[in-house]
Amino acid sequence: MIRIGQGFDVHRFAGKGEGFRLGGVAVPYHKRLEAHSDGDVLLHAITDGLLGACGMGDIGRHFPDDDPRWRDADSIGLLASTLRLAAEAGWVPVNVDGTVIAQAPKLAPYIGAMRQATADAMELSPGAVNVKATTSERLGFTGRGEGIAAMAVVLVESAPGRG
């Protein structure tokens, strides 16, 4: 059996900083992202999509932003925890397609590293992970440079021998 899930996340820029994490990669920028965890919107969207595909709710249910355990949490760790939950329920990821929406900074130089970091974290081949970046043509909060959004689609299948 196969299932598909979609995920979404957004974080606002908050003051000066040295950059942020995106897809498990450090992206230099003159602003930082406001977040309870490390604020990696792409990995949060992927985690949310994985939970959805497995019928396990959403990222906020598993890692609530008012829980001090998740303060400054590494999003790769959150994804790893979610992958364990999925495996325990009999699901394995097959592929991921993520889109980051940001007016700035330009993300093209980091896409390859994001694909590789995500593939490594999910134990997938890089060919099973796609990451795209786009702008919103200066419309909305991302277009005004107030934050970054990401969405992801995750395909899972029943683990061998489970269905």
Swiss-Prot record:
- This protein's source sits in the domain of life called Bacteria
- Tell me how this protein assembles: Homotrimer.
Q: Does the keyword Lyase apply?
A: yes
Question: Could you say which cofactors this protein requires?
Answer: a divalent metal cation
Query: What is the protein name stated in its UniProt record?
Result: 2-C-methyl-D-erythritol 2,4-cyclodiphosphate synthase
Q: Which keywords fit this entry according to its UniProt record?
A: Isoprene biosynthesis, Lyase, Metal-binding
Any binding details for the cofactor?
Binds 1 divalent metal cation per subunit.
Q: Name one GO biological process term.
A: isopentenyl diphosphate biosynthetic process, methylerythritol 4-phosphate pathway
Residues involved in 4-CDP-2-C-methyl-D-erythritol 2-phosphate binding: 9-11, 36-37, 58-60, 63-67, 134-137, 141, 144
| An example molecular function term from Gene Ontology annotations | 2-C-methyl-D-erythritol 2,4-cyclodiphosphate synthase activity
- Residues binding a divalent metal cation, per UniProt: D9, H11, H44
Q: What is its EC number?
A: 4.6.1.12
| Protein task | Involved in the biosynthesis of isopentenyl diphosphate (IPP) and dimethylallyl diphosphate (DMAPP), two major building blocks of isoprenoid compounds. Catalyzes the conversion of 4-diphosphocytidyl-2-C-methyl-D-erythritol 2-phosphate (CDP-ME2P) to 2-C-methyl-D-erythritol 2,4-cyclodiphosphate (ME-CPP) with a corresponding release of cytidine 5-monophosphate (CMP).
Which catalysed reactions does the entry list for this protein?
4-CDP-2-C-methyl-D-erythritol 2-phosphate = 2-C-methyl-D-erythritol 2,4-cyclic diphosphate + CMP
Q: Print the organism lineage.
A: Bacteria, Pseudomonadati, Pseudomonadota, Gammaproteobacteria, Chromatiales
The species this protein belongs to is: Halorhodospira halophila (strain DSM 244 / SL1)
InterPro entries per the UniProt record, alphabetical: MECDP_synthase (IPR003526), MECDP_synthase_CS (IPR020555), MECDP_synthase_sf (IPR036571)
Part of which pathway? Isoprenoid biosynthesis; isopentenyl diphosphate biosynthesis via DXP pathway; isopentenyl diphosphate from 1-deoxy-D-xylulose 5-phosphate: step 4/6
Family membership: Belongs to the IspF family.
Query: Could you tell me which NCBIfam families the record lists for this protein?
Result: ispF
The feature of type site (Transition state stabilizer) is located at: H36, T135
